[in-house]
Amino acid sequence: MRQISMQEAAARLKSGGLLLYPTETFFGIGCRVSDDDAIARVFQVKRRLFAMPLPVILADAGQLPLVAQVAPALAEDVARLERAFWPGPLSLILPARMHISPLLTGGTGTIAVRVSPHPVPCELATLVGEPIVASSANISGHPAVTRAEALDAELVQAVGAVLDTGPEPTGGEPSTLVEPLGNGRLHVRRSGAVHNDRLRAAGFEPESGIA
């Protein structure tokens, strides 16, 4: 398993490569969000269905306009969510910018974004100057892992490089996925590390099961 430095990892992403790297929960596999060929390779090496969207990690909230559009009616709620939960394991589902690959959105026209509390993906996104893809580093259907040594050998060989630095992922629940609906209402698309009681405590009204 070839482990590389942060600078090497950023250069690899800039040149169109894939990377295995730690996040706050599990190891992830990623590339630049603007690299359609690399995004397609993420699906291939994970054996992931193309209809399944890929989440994205931002360096900070300032990168949000690079990938997502926030309607004026949602702007206040999105800003409140950013202040209350970023950095943290809360992904916002928002309309994607027109230039964003449909592979990232799964054809839905929306994209899931978060600012990770783990320093590695945020520094990578800073160094490459754009958000990065952040899918779990596993073959689809296999368990996600928290240690580099536990990464699937086939995946490591296909990707070719591992950045193993910073805090070890803690495992546990994945990020919570929410879609802002306006007026403080949130459609909870996936329950996770940020529970409904925390959303309510921040002044939001979480809802599930919306068609």
What kind of feature is each model-predicted range?
Residues 1-211:
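Active-site-adjacent structural elements in enzyme catalytic cores
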